[in-house]
Structures are given as C-alpha cells and as structure tokens.
Amino acid sequence: MTGLPILEISGLRKAYGAVCAVDNVSLHVGRGEICGLIGPNGSGKSTFFDCATGLTRPNAGTVKLDGQDITGWSLNRIAREGRMLRSFQKTVVFSALDVEENLVIAGQMFTFPGLWSTFGIGAAARDRVAALKERARELIKIAGLWEVRHQPAGKLSGGQQKLIQFASMLMPEPKLILLDEPMAGINPKLIERVVESIRLANEKFGVSFLVIEHNIDVVTDICARIVVLDQGRKLAEGTPDEIVHNQAVREAYLGG
C-alpha cells in the first residue's frame, strides 16, 4: 500500500431512531489491498456498506474515495463514475442474454452515455462494441466462464451468476469494489473460483476490495487485513492471524 488510501472513512455513524447501527466507525482500504469486514449478524456491516456507497446517508462522518470527499453522494452518482462499485447479496443478471452479452451491456452502461450510442449504426459504434467485447472476453476468462460464455445467464447456477456479476463490475475498470457476501449460497468448488477471480483481478488490474464475508476461511485466505464490527462498533483490526487469535473476536464472532 502506497500513498493515500483508495477509500478512507472516518467517524461514520448511522442511527435509526434509538438504534445506532453504525457507531463512530473509521476504516480505510489501501490501494491494491484486499480488506475483509466481518462480524456477527446485526453488527452493522451492511449498513456500513450502504453508507459508504451512497445507498444510505450517514448521520455523521466522512467518506473519501481516492482523496475526494463523496459523503452524501447518491448510489447512482457514485456508480456512474465507475471508480467504486458494490455488489448486493441478491445477484442480478440479464437472464435471457448470454454471459458475454451481460458483460457488454454492463460495460456500455458505465462507459457510454446512452444505449444507442453503443449499439448504433456506423464505424464508431462498431469500434465501441468491438472494444467492449474484447474487454468482456478477457474478464470471462478471469471469472472461469469461458466454456459457458454463449449460454443464457438464466440457465447457469447461482454461483456462476455471481461470477457474471463480478466480471460485469470489472468492465468499467473500477479502482475499488465492495463485495457483500460473495460466497453465500454457492458450492465449495465455485467458492474456489470466486476466490481466484478476486485474486486475479487484484493482481492483474490492481483493483482494491473490501469484502463482507461470513466464511472465515475465505476471509483469512484472501485478505491482508481484517476489520471486525460488533454491535455497530469496531471491535478489532489486524492481520488474519491476529484476528483469529483475538479473544474478543472469538467471543463475539467465532463462538469463543
């Protein structure tokens, strides 16, 4: 990690009435870092993501992306810029389109101002489509979906659809991706594929990641640093080894 963090969040607070879901949490993600965010159910992880990505406005605190204060920006505004993207626990794909078409559409949504500017008539439009297809094919290989690239997304497994979603988020060349439980509901073999895809994207493109994940083996495997939340507050922060052997974390999250 060098220079300013790609994401720097300070004193974040979000309350719903008398319930404080996130209480004065500060966190940073370094450039090129894979950082984990864990905690028991109800610890504030998803609310923290929502505040960081503009889905929910925090009551207090600041969010800086690449050194720019984006506190209070809407989810759409942040997404349109393409520098920081997030996944949701519910996977969404274009079921009738094949894998490659899903990625091309995703790339168009971020890269060009209107659908018909990409899929129009003329040499410029053809060049844009060709560039998107080239990028899509590179990412399909990274996601391990090459053999099924021409199959409708709706015919593939839930794990494969998560890989489509992951590859789609890489289309606009983001600097940071926030993943919300990317391993949930997929079989062990595909978990290995998702882990490898995250690693490849990080190594090849320098994408930084902040990952919410309940699979502790995955988090300790791919993350250089882990932040633990409990009851809306930061409980601990450290290397995977430090977190696994932290007694307070074991009591709150790992079952003692």
Please describe what each predicted stretch is.
Residues 53:
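Helix-to-loop junction immediately C-terminal to a conserved catalytic motif
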Residues 57, 69-85, 89-91, 125-133, ...:
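ABC ATPase NBD coupling module
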